[in-house]
Amino acid sequence: MDVIVKMLILRKFVEQGNVCPIHLCVDIYKRAFPRSVNKGRSSYARRRRALELGRCHRCYRVYPPLFPEISRCDNRTCVPGISYNSKVRDYILWGVTEVIPHPGYNF
């Protein structure tokens, strides 16, 4: 509620031809978009979600690999390939997708 009042005051202030004070803009921005810590983006959370899908948390490939002798994923020094499933990547990194992943969706 406090942010709405400040924004209305700021709008009236600018409409009258005054210069907008930068410290007030910064204060409104900080209160309107509060920074919450991590939101489940820690390395532990990424590894947990990747394990849940059966994927590597670094390169998003299937891990453990089906054919270990030809796999490029060692789960330690691997990097994502040219094309990878962006839905899998988004779920592992951010934890939220448009559709909650289910083992039957053939990721």
Swiss-Prot record:
ZnF regions (C4-type) run across: 56-78
UniProt keyword Zinc present: yes
Q: Does the entry feature the keyword Signal, yes or no?
A: no
Q: Which GO terms describe its biological process?
A: regulation of DNA-templated transcription; symbiont-mediated suppression of host innate immune response
Region Basic, as annotated, extends over 46-49
The Swiss-Prot or TrEMBL record annotates one GO molecular function as:
zinc ion binding
Keywords from UniProt, A to Z, are: DNA-binding, Host-virus interaction, Inhibition of host innate immune response by virus, Metal-binding, Suppressor of RNA silencing, Viral immunoevasion, Zinc, Zinc-finger
Give all cystine bridges in this chain.
none
The family line of this record is:
Belongs to the carlaviruses nucleic acid-binding protein family.
Q: What does this protein do?
A: Suppressor of viral-induced RNA silencing. The potential mechanism of action is based on sequestering siRNAs.
Q: What is this protein called?
A: RNA silencing suppressor
Task: Provide the species name.
Answer: Chrysanthemum virus B (CVB)
Q: What is the lineage of its organism?
A: Viruses, Riboviria, Orthornavirae, Kitrinoviricota, Alsuviricetes
